[in-house]
Amino acid sequence: MNTTFEKTRLGICLVLAMSFVTAGSVASSDRTLLLADDPAKGGSTHHATRRDAMITALASANPNPSMGDEAQTFDRLVGTWDAEFTFQRDDGTVSQKKGELLFGWTMDGHAIQDLWIGYPTEPQKERSIGTTIRFFDTTLKQWRVVFINPQFNYVVSAQGGREGDRIVLRGVDTDGLPIRWIFSEMKPDSFHWQGEKSHDGGKTWKLEEDHHMKRRL
């Protein structure tokens, strides 16, 4: 793996880790601290170092060697993806927006994190942002996943893994109904993501989210 790609992976991890610290935005007082590497601007090097330390410690350039071949389940998604998001509501209406999706390793390579960013559309003024942490449970022999979106007070968990040429994760939504997330058509420069929900205990599934990703980095 060349040096340029390694630096790209690490940079992505730092961006993902920063989502925990900033939650997508930084107050004006904090912005001053983040720029504090220049004392001439009235900053303090102590503050900048304190904030950067957590980000640096959390990010990992590669999966932990202890994960073995299981790391390849999600390692192929590491990078930055341009996203075309499609949402299908219960009333039959469909909404679309553009955004991006970033993947990178964290926690000494024992977990992989992603960051979902939806660009704002009128009349919205703020981007939507959510993040997922995944790790392979060596007892269950499955990937365990937690997704959070603070803007909507939304937290949901799922678990699963590779099923043929797809990745399928199953869980329960906040309304108590079964959900499944499917990664498919996975190629080096593109993949397809679908979010489905069942209203009959898993007998049939309704498509709620249908997203297409193309690799940027």
Q: What do the predicted segments below correspond to?
A:
Residues 2-14, 24-94, 217:
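Amphipathic/hydrophobic helical signal segments and adjacent flexible N-terminal regions
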Residues 17-19:
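Hydrophobic membrane-insertion alpha-helices, especially the h-region
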Residues 57-59, 64-66, 71, 82-182:
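Central antiparallel beta-sheet cores of small beta-barrel/beta-sandwich binding domains
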Residues 107, 187-189, 217:
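Residue-level recognition of beta-strand termini and adjacent short loop/turns
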Residues 196-199:
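Conserved Ser/Thr-centered positions that define the repeating blades of beta-propeller domains
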Residues 212-214:
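Short beta-strand edge segments in extracellular beta-sheet folds
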